[in-house]
Amino acid sequence: MARQDRLRELLGPLHPYKSDDEEEDCAQEEEGEQEEEFVDAEELCSGGIKAGSLPGRARVSIPDEYTKEKCTVYGRFPLKGPWWRVKVQVLKPQRSRSYQVQGFPAYFLQVDMSPPDQKQICSLFLKECNLASERIQEFLKWVEKVSSFENLHFENLWETLRLFYRETEKKDKKLSTPREQQGEEMRVEKSFAFISAMVALQFPKVMEFLPSLFPRHFKRLISSSSDWVLGCIEDVLGTQPWKLGFRRITYREMKLVRCEASWTAFSQCPSLLQLMTPLQKNALVIYSKLRQTCREDGHTYIEVKDLTSGLSEHMSFEEACQSLAFLKDIDVVIYEKDYVFLSELYEAEQDIASSICELMSRPPWHLKVDVKNVLASIRGAKPNDPGSAEAVEGSKPEEVGSEQGDSVLDAQDGDDHVRSNGEHVANAEINDVPLDQDQVVALETICANAVTVLSGKGGCGKTTIVSRLFKHMEHLEETEVQQACEDFEQDQEASEEWLDCPKQSPAGVDKAVEVLLTAPTGKAAGLLRQRTDLPAYTLCQVNYSFYMWKTKNEVDKPWKFSTVRVLVVDEGSLVSVGIFKSVLQLLCKHSKLSKLIILGDVRQLPSIEPGNMLQDVFETLKSRQCAIELKTNHRTESQLIVDNATRISRRQFPKFDAELNICGNPTLPLSIQDKTFIFVRLPEEDSRSQSSKGEHRSNLYTAVKTLLQGKDFCSFESSKTSQFIAFRRQDCDLINDCCCKHYTGHLIKDHEKKLIFAVGDKICCTRNAYLSDLLPDKDQEAEGKGYGDAPDDDAKIKQDFESSTRLCNGEIFFITRDVTDVTFKRKRLLTINNEAGLEVTVDFSKLMANCQIKHAWARTIHTFQGSEENTVVYVVGKAGRQHWQHVYTAVTRGRSRVYIIAQESELRSATRKRGFPRQTRLKHFLQKKLSGSCAPSTGFASQPSSPRVGGRPDTQPPASHLCRTPDNKATADSARGDERWLSASVNDDVDTDEESAQLRGSKRIGDGFPFDEESPSKFRMVEAPSPQVSSVFQNMRLNTLTPRQLFKPTDNQDTGTAGVADDANDPSNQEMEM
């Protein structure tokens, strides 16, 4: 209430601030504004208006018409210029001379150019319209001569300007040619200032309300929309403004992509609320609550009772039910039983289930490869000679696209690497090489099945074995082709043309992509590319490439990924259902996709967006022998990290091999060179004390400074091989401040709290952007390591590089050069390097506006997930909502050394706390579709006869509901199945009895992670056939059915046509006969 009293409304012309030479602060966005929403390929290809960036903050001066006070205001103003009149809500913080804008301004065009200042405003407006200064002066003199400025206003400005051109052309044709005049007119007409003024004349409601309702879409709407779109919005604002609150309606009726006004934005427009009925207002409130809950908790649905009870302060239960029915009628939500879904989330989970089921129902593509050969090659052994017998059954794959890079395939052992040309170390036999049986099973499953999910911690070899399998396939094909060429060359009748033709494809011709490696983030894709020495893309890049191909209308040129037969998705826990649905559908419809391989760790944090794709698919497919866990760690230097990750997954306190106490005089361990898991203990604090927050910041700063300056801590000599991770953003800010002073010697912010960037800084992008959007305008300084000075004949290659190279959200760069160019305009140029082969010089202002860079010595756990580093430092901070999965995910980011900075009590609290289970239905949808489609459960003929796979494959029924162990309470295995859903072990220091009692009533017990870490029997519980199931199904054959009689036949009945009945000895039958 006090805050409302301090709010003030200003109304007046928008004047520039007298000392406004500052740069727009585009990097300092609020936390909720940083999320860049994924756009589906169908929406991209629709030609609709997409969201842009928020306008940067700037200071302006507003002479208030109410009080006549000249107010300095700081906020986001998408349009600037004294010809605009604005209405804005402001708040003045204590000890501040500037008002802070709350929300966004409403714009009104001063049609009469604000007499008596028409001449000045007209001059400034034409200058903003890119008209030359001398031309402006000529026009102003002409206006004074033929008329007066009192008669000049925006409604007749364009006609007056065109009349000026015609008269000057008649008077003196030597001054300018008609073509030059047309060019000037075109520049004015195409300028953003002119377009926005004309839109304001024609659609005043659009200018008044859209800056608040659609802040990201506003500038793009008025600059690129047709009069039809703007007219639709103008009409809706005057009659049915509630429609603008639902993205499905704005897309369906106005072709606006992911565009909707929030309930908070509507609340700032009381005149629009007056046009809504109570039913429409309640629908907007419910929709806002549903979307907020799904975004914050990761759910794809909410139970009706939970949703309505959370809205009891806003509406009655009857009103909530009426509003939900209204939302269903307009196709915004979907009901299923007592569940309410957002339509797009329901469709995403349904479409994923349908696509996976379709893949598993297609004729299988079996890879006849000796997987032991493949695994032996990773360990440096000599495999059997891969002859032509090891080919692909059916149609042979074409060339598998590969781009050789500087990196080498990351082998499982630290010092063992695989040569990219397919050669292997000799003097070893396969039988002498100890193979990981989990990896054997995993590769045989991939070869035999259409869909495979592999889960395991970092270092278990998921990425290595998959990439090695397809490199092996590529090598087999190359060997076969080379042998065929040699045989043909030895043929005496071979033509000279064949012998003289080059064996290599021309430069610049891309190979067909058959194995598509993908990851959810740019950093994860970069790591995948570095480990496998194969091309890797983000899922968004695959999605966007289809859009680019569609918009170019190149019918004769196929889509880049139209030849894909295998899709590999790494870091599956980070993949949201929305983007996975889009990419999977694209490849199923527009490529030759035959195999899907998902890699990840089901124990890690799920995606930030709603859904729990990896875990849901894993749990569904494990009973069909298509989901495998790799348990063995192959990184010898990180065994303690893996062991502690196991303990944390059981919610047990980790074991440290070194400890550093932070107090007045920090005590250093004797030697830390050979330690891998180190506890940096902070002093315990009294949370009830008022000075607790200050003590925590002081202790954390001391701990970070001790690590950075300690002589024994060689891991921090370079920030390129170490990374700080924290749960809270405020802890990241403090660590970045300390690291910035240590590594580069400057502060991260100036006195106005603006970020400072300099040479040596470690930065990261928080939004995706293409390199072509970041280059300097003249492109003279944009000489990157990736392309350099391109000659004229290579201009297209250079252009393709710039348009295809993407700076991804989460990607880390180092600033290597900082230059300010003053030749034309004051332009700041930064040279940034990602330490993976890309170094480019970009325009600093464009980098800030498009990528919104931040310092990156410290990152939050959610933004660093999917990446890894040699040394990782995790700051627990105050536990709060933090639980064991946060700690688990953080420590598994470290390859060779992990530090944990925490109070022991906070660390214990975080590791003991259970996660928050996500409410999703993908598992249910997938089970239902697989059982209904009778898709083959697995390629048993190609599976190994390992007891771990177990069972009698020929007699096991496909996808029987009796095999769903968590729901089958009739078997003894089911009782043990409940145990596997509880991550705590018997030795855990947690009150498991109390928690178990709380969770017995829920299907998704505990964290929902599907198996105990080191219990193979629990992991593959359903693989061994149940005695009750096998005893029934083993003897069932369609050709051995015996006709049974339901009733005793009479004399005139044909006994040969009796129906199927129960056994004659069944008591029910005896009763019926009586």
UniProtKB/Swiss-Prot annotation:
Its EC number is 3.6.4.12. Residues 934-946 have a biased composition (Polar residues). A motif (Nuclear export signal) lies at residues 1022-1046. It catalyses: ATP + H2O = ADP + phosphate + H(+). Keywords: ATP-binding, Chromosome, Cytoplasm, Helicase, Hydrolase, Nucleotide-binding, Nucleus, Phosphoprotein. Coiled coil: none annotated. It comes from the Eukaryota. Changing residue 462 to A: No ATPase activity. The modification Phosphothreonine is found at residue 992. This is DNA helicase B. The gene is Helb.
